[in-house]
């Protein structure tokens, strides 16, 4: 018999020994899983009626769940005891990234950023982009898997691909950075970012941004920053940016 375990640290709920399922718009009461989640629950995990687990709705809530009908195509569960806001953060983090030529590298970034903590991913094309389109639905599935693996209550938003000029014109309330490899850029992201602030960080394609694109971004209020001395792949730079912002906000002393 599989059981769910909870531990409490102050206001935070720490969930242990838990299988997690994703069900948009989940609420208290009887629910039916999708065929995909039903198959995973009954066939892969071999869960039985009476087994307990957790359900995330991707919108800020986690629920206790108990399997009522172990049907392999339409499993039914009873949800109760919602845990809302346990992983809320006082800041918003968005990263805009040019999809990599190899889709697996972009998917790797999406997985790791979701695990670490991110609110939104914006996709764009620029002058040096090698990929002009992206399978956003496939990317979203990668993020859903990461949400379940890392027991997150919120599913990050991922936007369709837009041109760079449109991206930098989109509104954002917070600090705006553009990561750029240039000898004249000495300001480090970790020094430029103000703890607790919302942040939007632009990460360029394999060939980096063009000088004209950087100038356009600066005119729109973006600040050029460095991520360190090493030359990083696009997806690595994006993960480093994500981790930097999260780490600064998790520090117990103000930076």
Enumerate the predicted regions with their spans.
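A generic structural signal for short beta-strands and their flanking turns/coil linkers
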Residues: 29, 49-51, 61-63, 73-75, ...
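RNA substrate-binding interface of SAM-dependent RNA methyltransferases
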Residues: 86-177
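Structured adenosyl-cofactor binding patch, chiefly the S-adenosyl-L-methionine
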Residues: 211-255
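N-terminal positively charged helical leader segments and presequences
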Residues: 2-84, 137
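Generic structural signal for residues in well-ordered beta-strands
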Residues: 77, 155-159, 224
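Active-site/ligand-binding-proximal alpha/beta "capping" segment
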Residues: 176-216, 222-229
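Short, ordered loop/turn segments at secondary-structure junctions
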Residues: 82, 126-129, 229-230
């Amino acid at each position: 018999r599989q059981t769910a375990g909870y531990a409490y640290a102050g206001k935070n709920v720490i969930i242990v020994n838990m299988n997690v399922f994703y069900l948009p718009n989940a609420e208290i009461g009887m629910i039916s899983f999708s065929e995909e989640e039903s198959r995973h629950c009954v066939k892969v995990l071999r869960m039985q009626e009476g087994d307990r687990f957790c359900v995330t709705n991707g919108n800020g809530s986690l629920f206790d769940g108990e399997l009522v009908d172990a049907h392999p195509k339409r499993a039914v569960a009873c949800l109760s005891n919602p845990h809302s806001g346990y992983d809320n953060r006082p800041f918003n983090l968005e990263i805009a990234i040019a999809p990599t030529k190899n889709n697996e590298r972009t998917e790797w970034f999406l997985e790791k950023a979701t695990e670490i903590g991110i609110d939104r991913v914006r996709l764009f094309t620029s002058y040096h982009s090698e990929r002009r389109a992206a399978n956003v639905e496939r990317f979203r599935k990668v993020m859903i898997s990461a949400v379940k693996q890392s027991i997150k209550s919120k599913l990050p938003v991922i936007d369709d691909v837009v041109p760079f000029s449109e991206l930098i014109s989109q509104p954002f309330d917070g600090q705006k950075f553009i990561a750029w490899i240039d000898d004249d850029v000495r300001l480090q992201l970790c020094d430029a970012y103000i703890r607790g602030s919302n942040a939007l960080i632009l990460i360029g394609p394999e060939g980096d941004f063009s000088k004209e694109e950087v100038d356009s971004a600066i005119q729109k209020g973006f600040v050029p920053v460095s991520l360190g001395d090493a030359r990083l792949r696009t997806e690595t730079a994006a993960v480093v940016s994500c981790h930097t912002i999260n780490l600064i906000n998790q520090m117990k002393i103000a930076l």
